[in-house]
Amino acid sequence: MSDELPAGATTHVDGVGYSLSATVLESRDANAHADFYRRLLGWTTIDEEPGWVILRPPGGGSGLSFSTDELYEPPVWPAQPGAQQMQDHLDIHVDDLSAAVERALACGATLAEYQPQDDVRVLVDPAGHLFCHFES
């Protein structure tokens, strides 16, 4: 990957350097899934091929990768016994929670029925992955 990471993004443990490149999200259509986050976050596509897309923020750093899995099943949340379980979610800091939620909905997200915190909004992307918007 040719994008440079920001200074300090690499840690060294026992002589080995580590830097998080991306979090990978699977769906039945990686290209459509990536398009949602491209529009939502304003990130740049740095690699795209059938079934695989990599997005990075304009300033560099770790990003999101998207992989097609034809057997992907969206999670059920809150969790229910016997249903597909959520394995991860994205926490996205925003500086205006109401405006960010409105924008996410306009991009194609839905508001999750269950909202466990007053200062966080749980949303669902078009592929069924949960993500949270929060202010600090």
Regions found by a protein language model. Give the residues of each.
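Short glycine-/small-residue motifs
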Residues: 133
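Vicinal oxygen chelate
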Residues: 2-21, 43-91, 101-125, 136
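Conserved active-site tyrosine of GNAT-family acetyltransferases
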Residues: 33, 37-38, 104, 128
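Conserved Rossmann-like nucleotide-cofactor binding loop
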Residues: 95, 129
